[in-house]
Swiss-Prot record:
UniProt source species: Caenorhabditis elegans
Disordered: region residues: 637-667
Family: Belongs to the monovalent cation:proton antiporter 1 (CPA1) transporter (TC 2.A.36) family.
Residues that carry a glycan: 310
The keyword Phosphoprotein belongs to this UniProt entry's keyword annotation: yes
Any GO molecular function: potassium:proton antiporter activity
InterPro entries membership: Cation/H_exchanger_CPA1, Cation/H_exchanger_TM, NaH_exchanger
Name of the protein in question: Probable Na(+)/H(+) antiporter nhx-9
Amino acid sequence: MSSRLFVFFLICYATADKIEKELISDGFQLFTWKWDDVHHVYVITVWLLIASLAKILFNLMKPISKWCPDSSLLIIVGLALGWILHQTSLSGATLDSHTFFLYLLPPIIFDAGYFMPNRALFENFDSVLVFSVFGTIWNTFAIGGSLLLMAQYDLFTMSFTTFEILVFSALISAVDPVAVIAVFEEIHVNEFLFINVFGEALFNDGVTVVLYQMFKSFALIGSENLSVLDYATGGLSFFVVALGGAAVGIIFAIAASLTTKYTYDVRILAPVFIFVLPYMAYLTAEMVSLSSIIAIAICGMLMKQYIKGNVTQAAANSVKYFTKMLAQSSETVIFMFLGLSTISSQHHFDLYFICATLFFCLIYRAIGIVVQCYILNRFRAKKFEMVDQFIMSYGGLRGAIAYGLVVSIPASITAKPMFITATIAVIYFTVFLQGITIRPLVNFLKIKKKEERDPTMVESVYNKYLDYMMSGVEDIAGQKGHYTFIENFERFNAKVIKPVLMRHQKRESFDASSIVRAYEKITLEDAIKLAKVKNNIQNKRLERIKSKGRVAPILPDKISNQKTMTPKDLQLKRFMESGENIDSLYTLFSDLLDRKLHEMNRPSVQITDVDGQDDIQDDYMAEVGSRSNLSAMFRSTEQLPSETPFHSGRRQSTGDLNATRRADFNV
């Protein structure tokens, strides 16, 4: 033991002596260069800064940003930087799969799940499931089989096996949610079309990764070493991986809701759990070989409605901003690195393979969409029209998911350079050509766009009434449809789930707070209309009496009122005689009633913005509507003179005022 201590002190003495000699020989230095200590983080920060500045510049260049999506412009910036680095003989950077799947992809998928309009997704769950599962399987085998058939005639410069080309066809079938959101948010398509394309793109990625991992395992094992049991296990893994990822997401969503429920005394920790637990869901699913994309997407979708009741409004807004910031930063870096990697990566250019891949991607997606929509239209009340099917076929944009998967192909697959080149070519074609031309096509085909107004209070109420009425009709008919499922879930949610996962929630058999609030507003509106009708009848009676030359009898209470009426009373009387002012008062009292009922139903402190306008909405469809309303507001501001609601010379109806108000409750 003593000998070991002696050796340890001897090593420490030698090390200290060496450091002392270096300090003495070099002397004291005012500045020391420590680039090796910070260069990794510094390079990442510089790339993020360049990408963010480029995005600001694009928004300032209105003629260009109007027609070109930000994703295509960021790819151009990456191409330019890659060319500069190549010409100056500097080492370029590439987007490796480890960085992409562990650091850049999780914020994007969490953002997509957290801001997913859950009601619209559930109403179209059947079509989203068909497109994302069966559509992906169809594209994978159709593209792979066609390319394999062409390879039998030696049309390509590199050879590949059956499972190797299925690996490529699986990754090239991945519709990228980043590219879809970037394009479809800007063209303001209707909710029905948006949720089907966006929902397919989100869950299609999870299915794609499952197929990719399965075929990659088959390729590494070798077709000659596979048995029937291996094929059966691989097919079973498709369902196990997908459903297991969903189960992981549900577990961590419950954990996030429960932890935020008990952070009332330490509110600063609530956002920590909101971001850490979904990321842990992603890592946990990845660790046990389940679908990490489905896990974090499901976690974000389920936890949203519960954590909002456990945190303050200020914290909820902070979560929205930070989620958007992370997702936007990741998207920006990914698209720029796609352009940069084009110059840095090793390529094998095969024109026939690229053209064949692009052709099969377009034609088989169109065939799959048409066939699936034909089958779905036979069982759906809301049909897919031909123009909807065309936009869905044309909107299958490829992006970072496909590139992240292709660069993670094992080096043992000899055709990997050809696959990388073909993937980049398909991404460029879809992002540039299809992304730029989809807006003119939407305008040319007159696709129904998102309405530039929020639903009125009456529309929201009667939509809710319709849900309960249809649930009753299904119950009477003895059929269990999705309206019955909605009612049962809402009752179970209000009675069991919310009291467990949310603070200040009592066990109720029915959650009717939104209907009560809306009914109070309808009652107020009816009272205002009744007062206006009585006022008009009295005015017409007085005019008829005056026209006949008779003097209307003055009652004693009116005489006393006229004698004691002050100038302020006369001003108020003239103000109330105007129907326009009655409308404005209704709007004022309606908003006050909403605020008071909201405070009664939500005892927690709510902090609102100064201007009352959220620039980040609760889901993507609200985001699209907000942008439309904002542009409409600016157009109306430029056309109308500045007038107050009480003194403008233009008549405003109650319906117009209601149309500009925000909806009171979520249908």
